[in-house]
Each structure stands twice: as C-alpha cells, then as structure tokens.
C-alpha cells in the first residue's frame, strides 16, 4: 500500500475558463475551496441575525467579532478599529479555510505558499501605504529605534529595514509551513495505521491501536492549530498596522 502525503496538496483543474496566449485559465480545486470558505463565512454572518437571545450561529459570530475587536484594541489601540473589516476578514478566512482542510478528502488552501504570500503582501502594502499617507516621512522613524548609540545606529537601521521588508516572508511562511507540516504528519500516521491493517490483517489492526490513538490526538491538535494560526496571523497584522498608526511608539 503506497502512502503519498504530498498528493493532498496538488492543485487540480476542475474545468477550463479560457486561454490567454498559450496559458490556460482554469477553475481549480483551490478556487473551489476558497469560494466555499467565503460562502460559509457569509452564511454565518447573514444567518446569525440580531436576536435578543442569541442562537448558536449568532453566538459564534458575536464571539468572533469580540475576539478580533479586543485583539485590535489591545495591540493597535482604538484607532486600529478602522482596520477591523480587513483583520476580521483575514482571521475568518484563514480560520475557516484551515478547519475545512482538516476534513478528510478536502483541500487546505493555506498549505500553499502562493495563497499565504498573497495575504501577507496585502497586509504589508496596506501598512506601507497607510503609514506613508498618514505620517509622511515620520513613518520611516520606525527604522530608527530610540536610545541607540550613534556608532551602531547604521547597523541597527540596516537590521530594522531588512526585518521590515522580510515581514511578508515570515508572515506567509509561518502559516504555510505549520499547515503543511501538520497535514503531512497526519497523513503519514493515518497511512501507517491503514498499512498495518491491510498488510498484517487482524494482527496489524491490533498493533495499530497506538498509532491510531496518536493519529486521533494529532487530529485534535490540528484543530487547535487551525484556530491558533489564524489568531497568530491576525495579531501580527495588528502589530504591523500599529507601526503605521503610531510610528513613534
């Protein structure tokens, strides 16, 4: 029995939309699950309503709203709430996409670097454009930390500038790598249990009890990671936006 933990990440075309020169434009499984994630979030927001006694959907929507709002206020202040639609959308999209990807035989959008890089670049250019538009040249004071001795200031400035422009890399790779590694580990453990059962029969299934228990534990951990990675992406977005809102702090 062959175990291929990488096959689950393959982007497969579902149907062709058209052609641009020699390049085929196709609707892929990645596109499909992006639409599914957006549809689930939209339905959650629309179905939550505004009842005096909140139901389950409204409770989920309200908890999500308050969680993101409190995260923004604690990291970027009340002025950061103007970015609430962006941060809330990013948090919900990543969280729902991650949770969908945990379901067997589905597709994990955030396990592809091109997707996480697009989200990280959106945050990066939002910070850069807003920071310059709001603060002018004062925005670049974030590259000059207070209290640094003059003789090492050029080195510190170089490090600060480098770290600023590397933010999209760390922001995107963190999410991508965690989701990729977790799903590969889950696939390997589950495949090992199945291989024992099919290869050794009843004896294999008995021997597979421990790996199966580890697979269940790993699956539960992946559910936690799905929420945690969405939170980490959102709070880093808040921290980066705080530089644009309060560049001198």
UniProtKB/Swiss-Prot annotation:
Topology with respect to the bilayer:
Multi-pass membrane protein
One GO biological process this protein is involved in is: proton motive force-driven ATP synthesis
InterPro entries per the record? ATP_synth_F0_asu, ATP_synth_F0_asu_AS, ATP_synth_F0_asu_bact/mt, F0_ATP_A_sf
Gene Ontology cellular component?
Answer: plasma membrane; proton-transporting ATP synthase complex
Please indicate which superkingdom the organism of origin belongs to.
Answer: Bacteria
State where the protein is found: Cell inner membrane
- Similarity section: Belongs to the ATPase A chain family.
Q: What job does the chain carry out?
A: Key component of the proton channel; it plays a direct role in the translocation of protons across the membrane.
Q: What is this protein called?
A: ATP synthase subunit a
Organism the protein comes from: Bradyrhizobium diazoefficiens (strain JCM 10833 / BCRC 13528 / IAM 13628 / NBRC 14792 / USDA 110)
């Amino acid at each position: 029995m062959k175990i291929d933990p990488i096959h689950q990440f393959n982007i497969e075309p579902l149907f062709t939309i058209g052609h641009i020169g020699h390049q085929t434009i196709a609707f892929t499984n990645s596109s499909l699950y992006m639409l599914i994630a957006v549809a689930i979030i939209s339905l959650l927001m629309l179905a939550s309503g505004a009842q005096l006694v909140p139901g389950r959907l409204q409770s989920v929507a309200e908890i999500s709203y308050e969680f993101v709002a409190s995260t923004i206020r604690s990291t970027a202040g009340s002025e950061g709430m103007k970015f609430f639609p962006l941060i809330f959308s990013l948090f919900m999209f990543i969280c729902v996409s991650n949770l969908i990807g945990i379901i067997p035989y589905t597709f994990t959008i955030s396990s592809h670097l091109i997707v996480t890089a697009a989200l990280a670049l959106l945050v990066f250019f939002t910070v850069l454009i807003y920071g310059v538009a709001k603060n002018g040249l004062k925005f670049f004071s974030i590259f000059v930390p207070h209290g640094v001795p003059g003789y090492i200031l050029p080195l510190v400035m170089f490090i600060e500038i480098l770290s600023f422009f590397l933010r999209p890399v760390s922001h995107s790779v963190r999410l991508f790598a965690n989701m990729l590694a977790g799903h590969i580990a889950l696939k390997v453990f589950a495949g090992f249990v199945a291989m024992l059962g099919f290869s050794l029969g009843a004896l294999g299934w008995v021997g597979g009890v421990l790996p199966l228990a580890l697979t269940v534990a790993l699956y539960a951990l992946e559910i936690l990671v799905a929420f945690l990675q969405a939170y980490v992406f959102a709070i880093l977005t808040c921290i980066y936006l705080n530089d644009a809102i309060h560049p001198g702090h």
